[in-house]
Amino acid sequence: MSFEPSRYLNQTILAVPKSGIRKFFDVAATMPGAISLGVGEPDFVTPYHIRNAAINSLLDGETAYTSNWGLLSLREEIARYMQGRYHLTYDPGKEILVTVGASEGIDLSLRVLMNPGDEVLIPEPSYVSYAPGVVFAGGVPV
């Protein structure tokens, strides 16, 4: 009897077709002058002042978990920015949630707003994780 790991995995995840995007990226990487509009990863080194600020935060012992909503000081700054730039007022204590990236924000939004079986319009072309995210949240991509 052989061990079959997929027996123990979520069947919904196993049913989602695998994306061919990585193969595409490999081909595009061989093309001189191609501009990648892929995963949104910068093509430059993080600026020194940002790296230095991260190092200083570590040296200062700022290594504990934050609120699930994100750092209050960051949320307050986001609220100030939105007010100054767009004349929109948000309560940083109740209306702003910081995520580690757009994918996490979209995933959380889908899980909060969708009910099982809801249909969700997916624009084309779109990021490869949008449709699977809808499926994982119990919805139907349309």
Q: What is each residue range found by the language model?
A:
Residues 112-142:
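PLP-dependent aminotransferase-like
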